[in-house]
Amino acid sequence: MTDLATLVPPLVLEQLTTEEQAYLSQVFSRFNGYPSLEEVWQLMDEQWLAFGCDPERMDERVTAFYRHPVWMLNGLFIEQHAQSLKHRQAFTDWIARQRPARLADFGGGFGGLARFVGQALPDAQVEVVDPHPHPAAIAVAASTPNVRFVPELSGEYDLLIATDVFEHVPDPIGLAAETAAHLRVGGQYLIANCFQPVILCHLPQLFHFHAAWDPAMRAMGLAPGEAVQYGRAYRRRGELDVPAARRIGDCGRKCYPWIQRLPKGRTRIGRALTAWFCH
């Protein structure tokens, strides 16, 4: 049996449930420590299949999947994975250059990015939007006093963040609009998506957004701007036009069977073709 104290920070370990401790012990024994990124994806897929999840039905099976301890493993994994930390630092550096007074990380999970940002911008108000944050995440964030967990967005923000969120939800256009409504005009939304079949919980009915996301955001009124690692910054220009974004999304879905025939690495061409066909 693996000694969790050698792999899990004490502040986190004392907040884990018996089920979480048992699962982590099993995983660490199976992989002789932390699994690789690909093995974490494998573990997620195992649970998706074990719960019998259907990507077309967001029901209690999917809810149970997202409550499984594999997501605690994912949060801990990111805290020590070099590539993930590189992304986090790059996001933080970009955010710090924007100097927002108030920002929120929507679906910020374990709060790692928010803690980085809170330390880089000690005078900023940093919120992690999660209706049911894990006690361990709250405990770890306590050392960064300007970071707090909130159940929902409220009021107006200078900057919003959503990383690896929209590929998991059935209506990403609607959720993007709902959240962007809290962004001040001229504010920026840092979004990083993966509309690709990396893991089973990336909904396949959304894969057309790999090429159609930027055109849809532009139609909505969120102008695509600077690329930041695997994400992009979108600036709010004014009122949000959700029907226009949905039209682009629907057109992108129809174009997708042809777009996906492009060679790998041709995302820019796919986006350009989608924008041309769906303008």
Please state what every model-predicted region is.
Residues 164-168:
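Short catalytic micro-motifs in class I SAM-dependent methyltransferases
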Residues 161:
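A conserved beta-strand element that flanks and buttresses the S-adenosyl-L-methionine
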Residues 2-155, 176, 192, 199-278:
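Conserved N-terminal segment of class I S-adenosyl-L-methionine
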Residues 174-185:
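A short glycine-rich, Lys/Arg-flanked "PGG" loop and its adjoining helix->strand segment in the class I
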Residues 186-194:
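Conserved beta-strand signature within the Rossmann-like core of class I S-adenosyl-L-methionine
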